[in-house]
């Protein structure tokens, strides 16, 4: 079984660096990391950082233009993945190392589950009081937004049955 760790990124240099360094060390040898970079709004520094890892066989990096629909964007990312399961992560998220270690067992032990509710550490660069008020976020003393910020994570077999939908 192969897991694709699928990541979308735009301008989160510190966050994508942290996430990629973590995943490269924590993932199994047979798993892959797939990064989809927004080439229209993304920064050259982010592309440079992820390009530094292009020679690594476990990683693939793709630059495309985000067209204002997250469902389409995440479906594009899904199509780039070659694993049996996909674990989609935003650049500003950091999964716990125990989760990554146990994920293969969780997936194999629960073959009928298509999604899992996973707490994430969510940080936002340049967060302002206006952002916090507008989005009604709670920020703790470690700058984590809405901790524990539970998100439905899609861990799907690549059978085309699960898609992100626009609404």
Each model region followed by its residue ranges:
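Hydrophobic beta-strand segments of well-ordered beta-sheets in folded domains
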Residues: 2-5, 31-35, 113-116
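A conserved hydrophobic helix/loop-capping motif in glycosyltransferases and polysaccharide synthases
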Residues: 3-15, 19, 26, 36
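Acidic donor-binding segment of Leloir-type glycosyltransferases
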Residues: 21-63
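Short, acidic/glycine-rich phosphate-metal binding loop used to engage nucleotide
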Residues: 63-70
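Catalytic-site signature of metal-activated, phosphate-bearing donor transferases
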Residues: 71-78, 97-167
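Short aromatic/hydrophobic "clamp" motif used to bind/position activated sugar donors
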Residues: 86
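The conserved acidic donor/metal-binding loop of glycosyltransferases
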Residues: 90-94
């Amino acid at each position: 079984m192969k897991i694709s760790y699928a990541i979308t990124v735009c301008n989160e240099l510190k966050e994508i660096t942290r996430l990629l360094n973590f995943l490269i060390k924590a993932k199994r040898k047979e798993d892959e990391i797939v990064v989809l970079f927004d080439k229209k709004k993304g920064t050259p520094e982010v592309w440079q950082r992820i390009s530094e890892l292009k020679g690594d066989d476990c990683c693939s990096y793709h630059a495309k233009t985000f067209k204002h629909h997250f469902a389409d964007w995440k479906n594009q990312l899904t199509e780039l993945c070659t694993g049996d399961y996909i674990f989609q992560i935003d650049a500003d998220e950091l999964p716990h190392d125990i989760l990554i270690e146990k994920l293969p067992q969780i997936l194999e032990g629960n073959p009928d589950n298509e999604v899992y509710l996973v707490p994430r550490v969510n940080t936002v660069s340049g967060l302002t009081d206006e952002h916090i008020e507008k989005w009604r976020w709670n920020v703790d003393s470690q700058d984590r937004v809405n901790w524990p910020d539970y998100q439905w994570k899609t861990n799907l077999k690549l059978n085309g049955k699960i898609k992100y939908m626009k609404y």
